[in-house]
Amino acid sequence: MVARQLLASGGAWLSLGGTQILLDPGPGSLVQATKRKLDPAKLDAIILSHRHLDHSGDINIMIEAMTDGGRKKRGVVFAPNDALDQDPVILSYLRSFPEKIEILTEGGSYKVNDVSFTTPIKHRHPVETYGFIFRTQHHTFSWVIDTKYFDKLPSYYEGELLIANVVMLNPKVAVDHLSLPEVKMIIEEIKPKIAILTHFGMNMWRARPWELARNLSEETGVSVIAARDGMKFDLARLEGVSPEASSGLARFE
Ligand SMILES: [Zn+2]
């Protein structure tokens, strides 16, 4: 999907009460962001869930863009340790450009302005990988990043909004990714107001994610949305009130 860019792989741009966070800048992140009038020079933080290229491909250029090529020391980069040690995806020469680099660990909590987030559990994935619970002044939402499904996985996440990386249509024992039936179990346990499916593999894509999402809505009673390139989701939808004074969440996967 990434190599052919059947879906864009630039990650997600979180705009939370004035705080700008880029999550998982995969290949094309810079192009997708500027195309959508999102200015990387305004980023407060870049978060990397894990070092795989579909999540990290553009992280170096986005660090450069956030810091005006290193001329302005600003912003924070969050990444697991193995994105920085041997065979690093974050180049050494630009590690002094951001204000700091913070290492993600299991059970960690972090802050960017008045947004906080936690990395509750190390995921089952070939490299060190974390999902996130984000808390703003008004909302809590979880993003379940790549992982093999495991017992109690849903119990680590919470919130009115659940975003899940659904790579596979059906579970495959040998692949460390979530499948649609597993994400259904997560939705049924967390019972968010809204769930967003994203990060589709080829079989998911061929099965028309928007139709799968509609079926899942009927089966679970939770409003399930299939993400699409450039989709913008306003967190005010969780309140059922006017979007004024609220934060928005745009994604460009
Ligand atoms: Zn991965």
Where are the regions a protein language model picked out?
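Active-site neighborhood of phospho(di)ester-bond hydrolases with catalytic His/Asp-centered motifs
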Residues: 22-26, 43-50, 54, 79-80, ...
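Conserved beta-strand hairpin/beta-sheet module of binuclear metal-dependent hydrolase folds
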Residues: 1-36, 129-145, 161
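Binuclear metal-ion centers of metallo-dependent hydrolases, dominated by the metallo-beta-lactamase
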Residues: 152-161, 169-253
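Short beta->alpha connector loops
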Residues: 27-28, 83, 123-126, 145-150
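Conserved catalytic scaffold of divalent metal-dependent phosphoesterases
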Residues: 114-115, 136, 159-170
